Swiss-Prot record:
Subcellular location: Cytoplasm
Pfam families according to UniProt: UreF (PF01730)
Biological source species: Ralstonia nicotianae (strain ATCC BAA-1114 / GMI1000) (Ralstonia solanacearum)
Complexes and interactors: UreD, UreF and UreG form a complex that acts as a GTP-hydrolysis-dependent molecular chaperone, activating the urease apoprotein by helping to assemble the nickel containing metallocenter of UreC. The UreE protein probably delivers the nickel.
Annotated protein name in UniProt: Urease accessory protein UreF
Length: 229
């Protein structure tokens, strides 16, 4: 059972107040709005649900693998998989997004003194570190269970997408909350799917999301925009 201290740490990591700049990214959603693929509450809910399925196929199982390697002190494996994940980001803005957020969280870990010195040294030694790798490190450092940490990571992603949809479409606050509430079960299912993929030998990671890649590439030169991705 999650203790009060673990729950508090979990809420801290999943908080929109975490200074990693997540609010400035839409991960292709703004380009989808520009292209009219997303234009109302229903289409926004569908877009975010599909994005969560993409996350469950690669980023979420990778998060679990990174968590296990951080916990076991397998720093070479952490570095190798982190480099692989960065290389799978299909556009410059998506690479910059995960690298900036990862750097910001790694810096916070160092400033807060979270985790063992070896972990902090490994984070500091990376020229670029992705966000799932840094978040998994923080979860290990704070004693958060793997499944709880991944659920928080996934929910924070959904929450940020909802906030982006509210701003970009725009939608009312109640519509945003309906989308968020409607995806509660999907967040849990994503964690289950990720655990199954991470347990495969070799891990079953799929980066297939051509629509996101195309929209992100278009967003890089979009004339007017609110978000950095």
């Amino acid at each position: 059972m999650t203790s009060a201290a673990q729950l508090t740490a979990l809420l801290h990591l999943a908080s929109p107040a975490l200074p990693v700049g997540a609010f400035s990214y839409s991960q292709g959603l703004e380009a989808a709005v520009e292209a009219r693929h997303v234009h109302d509450e229903a289409s926004a809910a569908r877009w975010i649900a599909e994005g969560l399925a993409v996350l469950a196929a690669c980023e979420a199982p990778l998060w679990l693998l990174q968590y296990a390697d951080w916990q076991a002190g397998r720093l070479d494996a952490v570095a190798e998989r982190d480099g692989w994940f960065l290389a799978t980001r299909e556009t410059r803005e998506l690479r910059l997004e995960t690298a900036q957020m990862g750097w910001s969280l790694a810096r916070l870990i160092a400033q807060m003194g979270w985790g063992a010195p070896a972990m902090r040294d490994a984070l500091a030694a990376r020229a670029a570190i992705t966000f799932p790798t840094a978040f998994a490190a923080a979860a290990v450092a704070l004693g958060i269970e793997a499944r709880d940490g991944l659920t928080a990571y996934s929910f924070a992603w959904v929450e940020n997408q909802v906030a982006a949809a509210v701003k970009a479409i725009p939608l009312g606050q109640a519509a945003g909350q309906r989308i968020l509430f409607g995806l509660h079960a999907a967040v849990g299912q994503a964690a289950e799917d990720a655990a199954r993929r991470a347990a495969c030998h070799p891990p079953e990671l799929s980066t297939f999301s051509p629509g996101l890649g195309v929209l992100s590439a278009r967003h890089e030169t979009q004339y007017s925009r609110l978000f950095r991705s």
